[in-house]
């Protein structure tokens, strides 16, 4: 949102179209010239694509904010084996978040294939609402769940032994002449996140 607000302030006559999808589809759309720029949580293809890391984010396990999970947060202290007994809602296959979650769970000693995955959902807002309503727990980025955590709608548990986070990348086709709007958008991302060339 910060980037979109700044872009709109600087270029009020420009209109941008936003499509929410997983990292695999973002890269496909970039390669096939269906989109000029995109954002991914994982680096997938480097032959055609240029990735600019602009933000460090970490994944967290989110749960409903109930007495059971508040107690678990106090007692578990870094042990997430309880996750194996939960209904889990994941991002869809192809999602950078899902790929990164699998990697971090393995590092924490959890085999992702042992999870009781009851749903795979594309939209993060739908996942967060489903968790709030008690359908299950999920693994999403801390940034994506910040407002819900702050408001007390969900609880966030860190994943132990995770690294220092994952890069969120701006991606574009390096073999394709970008539109003026796309170049201006990339410039705004660089300004907002203070990225050197």
Identify the function of each model-found stretch.
Residues 50-60, 116, 150-164:
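Short beta-strand->loop
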């Amino acid at each position: 949102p910060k980037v979109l607000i700044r872009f709109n302030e600087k270029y009020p006559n420009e209109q941008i179209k936003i499509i929410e999808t997983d990292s695999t589809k973002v890269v496909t759309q970039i390669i096939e010239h269906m989109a000029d720029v995109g954002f991914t949580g994982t680096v997938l293809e480097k032959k055609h694509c240029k990735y600019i890391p602009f933000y460090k984010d970490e994944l967290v396990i989110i749960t409903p904010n109930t007495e059971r999970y508040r107690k678990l947060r106090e007692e578990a202290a870094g042990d997430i084996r309880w996750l194996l007994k939960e209904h889990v809602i994941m991002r869809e296959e192809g999602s950078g978040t899902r790929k990164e979650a699998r990697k971090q769970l393995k590092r924490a000693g959890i085999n992702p294939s042992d999870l009781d995955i009851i749903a795979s959902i594309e939209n993060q807002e739908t996942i967060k609402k489903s968790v709030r309503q008690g359908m299950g727990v999920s693994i999403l980025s801390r940034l994506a769940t910040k407002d819900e955590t702050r408001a007390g709608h969900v609880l966030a548990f860190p994943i132990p032994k995770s690294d220092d986070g994952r890069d969120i990348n701006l991606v574009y086709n390096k073999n394709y002449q970008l539109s003026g709007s796309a170049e201006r958008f990339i410039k705004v991302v660089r300004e907002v996140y203070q990225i050197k060339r």
